[in-house]
């Protein structure tokens, strides 16, 4: 099944973007070629841009604290797997402590590093990081891969508590949902939400159908419409019945 996820609010949308950026960063950092490490570095700049929101850290701390207060009363409950509960609570408490230790403006260490700031300013220009534009950066790219990797890992380190916090919040949200099998009649599906508030919608479709879900929602109803794309033309609505799995997640 192919999984599509749709956020219901700006906070989850931001966390999904962060998750995607950190996954891309980890992939390219693990590679060897200087061009791949260039992608890792420019992705680091994107992460800094997203995490630079003034309220992101406080939002994450509030949500983690809320989850801690929700889960803590289940300690000692015989109906709850205590080892799993303690693992989650320990992870939350450690991440809260790491967030609390973050000092100053998020990503300021990248701004204060003049060399990185010069690369960052050139990276937004198409072809702006050529060897004649940034000879010192080109020289750094000739260093051994492990040394470059250590440098980039050092620069991402102050942002890792935000990665860990986002991962916990998204995991708890995803685990809160229960998948149901539904059918989009002639490619369209609607469901009343009865005023319930959700954070995230997941749509899983069989890959062999080659359909693409487009989703929208408000506090009363959600819509899922399926399209299909042939080659490089614009996707078109389908008129076939589409079976899929729908999961609504709420923290």
UniProtKB/Swiss-Prot annotation:
UniProt entry keywords in alphabetical sequence: Cell cycle, Cell division, Cytoplasm, Septation
Recorded superkingdom: Bacteria
Coiled coil: none
GO terms for cellular component: cell division site; cytoplasm
GO biological process, one term: FtsZ-dependent cytokinesis
Chief location of this protein within or outside the cell: cytoplasm
Subcellular location: Cytoplasm
Stated family: Belongs to the ZapD family.
PANTHER family noted in UniProt: CELL DIVISION PROTEIN ZAPD
Record function comment: Cell division factor that enhances FtsZ-ring assembly. Directly interacts with FtsZ and promotes bundling of FtsZ protofilaments, with a reduction in FtsZ GTPase activity.
Known partners and oligomeric status: Interacts with FtsZ.
Protein name (Swiss-Prot/TrEMBL): Cell division protein ZapD
Organism of provenance: Burkholderia ambifaria (strain MC40-6)
């Amino acid at each position: 099944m192919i999984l599509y996820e749709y956020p219901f609010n700006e906070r989850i949308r931001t966390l999904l973007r962060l998750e995607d950026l950190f996954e891309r960063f980890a992939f390219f950092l693990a590679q060897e070629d200087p061009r791949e490490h260039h992608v890792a570095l420019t992705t680091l700049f994107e992460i800094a841009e997203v995490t630079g929101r003034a309220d992101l850290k406080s939002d994450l701390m509030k949500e983690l604290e809320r989850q801690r207060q929700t889960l803590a009363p289940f300690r000692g409950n015989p109906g709850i797997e205590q080892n799993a509960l303690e693992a989650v609570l320990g992870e939350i408490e450690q991440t809260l402590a790491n967030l609390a230790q973050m000092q100053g403006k998020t990503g300021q260490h990248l701004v204060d590093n003049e060399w990185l700031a010069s690369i960052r300013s050139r990276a937004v220009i198409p072809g702006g990081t050529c060897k004649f534009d940034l000879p010192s950066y080109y020289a750094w790219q000739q260093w051994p891969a492990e040394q470059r990797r250590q440098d980039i890992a050092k620069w991402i380190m102050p942002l890792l508590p935000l990665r860990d916090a986002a991962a916990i919040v998204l995991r708890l949200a995803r685990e809160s949902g229960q998948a149901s099998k539904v059918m989009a009649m002639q490619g369209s599906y609607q469901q009343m939400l009865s005023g319930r508030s959700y954070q995230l919608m997941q749509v899983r479709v069989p890959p062999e159908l080659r359909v693409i879900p487009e989703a929208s929602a408000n506090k009363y109803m959600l819509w899922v419409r399926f399209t299909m794309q042939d080659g490089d033309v614009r996707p078109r609505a389908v008129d076939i019945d589409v079976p899929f799995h729908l999961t609504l997640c709420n923290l």
